[in-house]
Amino acid sequence: MFIPYLDLLASANARKVKITNIKCVRTRIGFRPSLLVKVETDAGIVGIGECHHDENSMGAKDIVLNVIKPILAGQDPYDLERLVFKMSTRTSYYGGNHGIPLHAITGVEFALWDILGKLADQPVHNILGGGPHRKQVRAYCTSRPRDMLSKDSCAEFAERMKKQKFTAAKVDLIRDQRWEQLDNRMMSNAEVDRNARGFQNVRDAVGPDFDIAVHAHWEFDFDSALRMAHAVAPIKPWWFEDPLPIGYNEQWIKLTDRSPVPILTGENLYTRDDFRPFIVNGAVNKIEIDISMAGGLLEAKKIADLAETYYIPVATHNVAGPVATVASAHWAATVREFAGHEAFMNNPLNADGRSCNGDNAVLGYGVDLLKDGYLQFNGKPGLGITLDEKLVKEKYMVAGETWWD
């Protein structure tokens, strides 16, 4: 692991730091439940993290308190890579380094990076992998017009994007079946035609310089995916996301070879092991990494570096709360071939375009997290978060949960 401030991190006083406690509490700050994690040290420095992608956070809480906490007790937070290996090995029989165990590890890893940054008196993006490539991170909004077949609705969407100052958006396809009720992977010609018209309406409304990603939610068989790729080709999409089912298959190579638009996947993939076949076999044009799923900041950096050697740009998938969003942004700043960072604006608190992914007031951030369509850093050490525990406790704890003190 390369850390440019190693002389600070390896000082005699710093090496005496030990992890003394780990606490967690289930919350709902974004649009899904997530587990906030606090890692305490004998130096009085505390790290904050967030475990996401668990429907009620019970699984992640169990793993953090009963598996991870004993592993980290008395350990040196500077041994981050070794500690992540130990956590991954110990939890591997829960799901082979997939699913909730890795979500739990990731939230704790965020907190460890927060501690390292505070000890070095540097923002995380300065000590992760050699420093940042950018001072702010381009965001894209995941949203869509109320009715893509209505030009008026698309015009309203374009005005909203302009007001919030986004230059890119990810837009869901039109489907006859609701996503959660799908019973097959086939798409009718009528659906394909409606999407061709709908996405053309969106393009006409936002103009040629606005990036549009087409979002498919891993729904289609090969034939449907290829027909849809041709249908949306006239709008020159940023990418066509997850057109085939999750997981590597040789059909991804075939689709990428034959598609007239860039193919992307990654939001459901874990660690380098899942990403590697897509990258080395040319099965995609772009990848996106969900930092909360892929294994944390360090693992995601390794994935991005592998992609870079194959000239594959990287974006993020991000449906987590504000804490994990900040952690993800720090990582994104260190990725040279970075395309865009997902921002969710469905919470009314985010409507003005100055925040995203839930109530940013919990961060104690001091500056707007989102400005002119870019994620911002406040220059503070670690993740730059001063968690407003009073606000979280009063408004965002899951019902029946006990506060971590």
Predicted regions and their residues:
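Structured beta-strand/loop patches that form or line metal/cofactor-binding pockets in enzymes
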Residues: 3-48, 52-53, 402
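Metal- or metallocofactor-binding catalytic centers and their adjacent structured scaffolds
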Residues: 6, 42-119, 351
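Shared catalytic-loop signature of beta/alpha-barrel
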Residues: 66, 82, 230, 236, ...
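Flexible hinge/switch segments at interdomain interfaces of large molecular machines
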Residues: 128-136
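Metal-dependent enolase-superfamily TIM-barrel catalytic cores that perform enediolate-based chemistry
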Residues: 135-137, 142-254
